[in-house]
């Protein structure tokens, strides 16, 4: 249905759907309604729907949120495979995900774009470590 909405020819839809279902590892769930899929499986299905039909601009809002590490990596590989020739705008809270997938990374804070650039640029400009600030308050507890 989504492929048809995006203008795919009827003869190409079945093959494209089969390929996507294989790519998101949902072959054994082909005949299940989406409401019966797990949260991770629903996310995989959503990513497949986003890419089917050859869309040139794709928005993905935290596509791997709530997934375990292996499922996240699986989706990452799929995104790498299908992103060529497309503009993919992806939101994430995982810097490793942005680093692996992003050609350009934008960092937002309080609803505003704080900085933008390649992973290398951001690491050179802002560093790769963490800052830890510890403040000790005098508790005036008698010894």
Predicted regions and their residues:
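Conserved ABC ATPase signature
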Residues: 33-37
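ABC transporter nucleotide-binding domain
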Residues: 77-143
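Helix N-cap at the start of a conserved alpha-helix in ABC-type nucleotide-binding domains
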Residues: 69-71, 100
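A short, proline-enriched helix->beta-strand linker immediately N-terminal to the Walker B motif
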Residues: 52-56, 85
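Short loop immediately C-terminal to the Walker-B catalytic DE motif
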Residues: 64-65
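Catalytic Walker B motif of ABC-type/P-loop ATPase nucleotide-binding domains
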Residues: 58-61
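Hydrophobic anchor residue at the start of the ABC signature
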Residues: 47, 75
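Conserved ABC ATPase "signature" region
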Residues: 4-7, 11-29
């Amino acid at each position: 249905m989504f492929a048809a909405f995006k203008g795919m020819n009827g003869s190409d839809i079945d093959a494209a759907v089969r390929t996507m279902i294989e790519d998101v590892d949902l072959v054994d769930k082909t005949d299940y309604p989406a409401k019966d899929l797990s949260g991770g499986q629903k996310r995989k299905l959503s990513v497949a729907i986003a890419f089917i039909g050859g869309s040139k601009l794709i928005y993905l809002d935290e596509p791997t949120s709530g997934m375990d590490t292996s499922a996240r990596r699986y989706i990452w590989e799929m995104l790498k495979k299908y992103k060529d020739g497309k503009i993919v705008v992806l939101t994430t809270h995982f810097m490793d995900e942005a680093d692996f997938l992003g050609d350009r990374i934008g960092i937002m804070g309080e609803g505003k774009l704080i900085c933008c650039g390649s992973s290398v640029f951001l690491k050179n400009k802002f560093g790769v470590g963490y800052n830890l600030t510890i403040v000790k308050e005098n508790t005036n507890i008698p010894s």
